[in-house]
From Swiss-Prot:
Role according to the record: Catalyzes the condensation of iminoaspartate with dihydroxyacetone phosphate to form quinolinate.
Enzyme class: transferase
Name of the featured protein: Quinolinate synthase
SUPFAM superfamilies, per database record: NadA-like
Superkingdom: Bacteria
Biological classification of the source: Bacteria, Pseudomonadati, Pseudomonadota, Gammaproteobacteria, Enterobacterales
Subcellular location: Cytoplasm
Chain positions recorded as iminosuccinate binding sites: H47, S68, Y139, A140, N141, S156, H226, P227, E228, T243
Keyword set, alphabetical order: 4Fe-4S, Cytoplasm, Iron, Iron-sulfur, Metal-binding, Pyridine nucleotide biosynthesis, Transferase
UniProt pathway annotation: Cofactor biosynthesis; NAD(+) biosynthesis; quinolinate from iminoaspartate: step 1/1
HAMAP family associated with the record: NadA_type1
InterPro entries: NadA (IPR003473), NadA_sf (IPR036094), Quinolinate_synth_A_type1 (IPR023513)
Binding-site residues for [4Fe-4S] cluster, renumbered to this chain: C113, C200, C297
Entry's EC annotation: 2.5.1.72
Amino acid sequence: MSVMFDPEAAIYPFPPKPLPLNLDEKQFYREKIKRMLKERDAVMVAHYYTDPEIQQLAEETGGCISDSLEMARFGAKHSASTLLVAGVRFMGETAKILSPEKTILMPTLNAECSLDLGCPIEEFSAFCDAHPDRTVVVYANTSAAVKARADWVVTSSIAVELIEHLDSLGQKIIWAPDKHLGNYVQKQTGADVLCWQGACIVHDEFKTQALVRMKALYPEAAILVHPESPQSIVDMADAVGSTSQLINAAKTLPQQKLIVATDRGIFYKMQQAVPEKELFEAPTAGEGATCRSCAHCPWMAMNGLKAIADGLESGGAAHEIHVDAALREGALLPLNRMLEFAATLRS
């Protein structure tokens, strides 16, 4: 594939880890957040990959814990005038696209995503222009500008079904930005898929030989894998799926030990779903101290209690998401196509 930008060669600067809080500080910020959510007529939506204490707070305050699209849909349906989005920036953008009349706040606007960073709109648009015969399908983990350039937006939970549908219509596909998910979808469907070469820095680090060794230690364990992982990891899986699909798989699989190849933030909701089961993180390069993310997104970790309290208290340019009106209209079209398609799958 010939593109000006090479996501595989990109090195993304990681944010510093938030300063740890003591128990008194945590309690102070928890109470402050609860109070300010009420004062601002706000509801908190948190991604599965945020830290457990953030997910717990979302639950306690009547919010939502889910994947990025369901976060946005929950916010759109909720009566609150303000959404506090605990996640990464594209999630706040998606919420604003679906709820333009609401105030969308984030703990920080510097919470990035390697998939988003790895798909700059200028280079991606040029790539699409070079293949005008292909239908452009982009993952939810992209900027509003990239979504606006696409024909379809898709989540991992319906990616296979959507590509099967487009393939049945004789359409050839450009898939972006995640190469591993794109390759997985292509293998599952047999469709003509041209992949952009981005990757999630968390899932890209799962190591095959280390997973083989872990499986040998726990031969009775099932392996659950998110399809953003490399194909060699997917090939070892007993279940492959999106975050919500992996939680469901944890409930339905008979094994009492589960090795989970996705961000360890998912363990909070997964353990709630299967309290009797033992969960293990799939290995990255952590043993050799060469992993960068070590099974937890460093940008998700920016969503700390202090940052959430600051976002609710201060708002403004440092915390509020804005999406240009024309860009919003462009991104809303492929998002609505996906939502309508997803509705047909549920009916």
